[in-house]
Amino acid sequence: MLYPSVDKLQKTVPSKYTIVTVAAKRARQIQDGKRVKVANPKSYKPVGKALEELFSGEVVVTNQPQD
């Protein structure tokens, strides 16, 4: 079972595609050695940890135009 669920995540980030993109980028950072911002994450995989960070508000989505 995925924690947090996609439905819960969509309350903070409305687009499923944005959730996937942000979680993937953050998971790569975690995998490359960046510190996890959530204390005692339930997941042991980088993607799960990234989703938990997104749900808790530790990772914030900002819209920045691409050049």
From Swiss-Prot:
GO terms for molecular function: DNA binding; DNA-directed RNA polymerase activity. PANTHER family: DNA-DIRECTED RNA POLYMERASE SUBUNIT OMEGA. One of its GO terms (biological process) is DNA-templated transcription. Belongs to the RNA polymerase subunit omega family. GO terms for cellular component: DNA-directed RNA polymerase complex. Its EC number is 2.7.7.6. The keyword Transcription applies. This is DNA-directed RNA polymerase subunit omega. Keywords: DNA-directed RNA polymerase, Nucleotidyltransferase, Transcription, Transferase. The RNAP catalytic core consists of 2 alpha, 1 beta, 1 beta' and 1 omega subunit. When a sigma factor is associated with the core the holoenzyme is formed, which can initiate transcription. The gene is rpoZ. Coiled coil: none annotated. It catalyses: RNA(n) + a ribonucleoside 5'-triphosphate = RNA(n+1) + diphosphate. Promotes RNA polymerase assembly. Latches the N- and C-terminal regions of the beta' subunit thereby facilitating its interaction with the beta and alpha subunits.
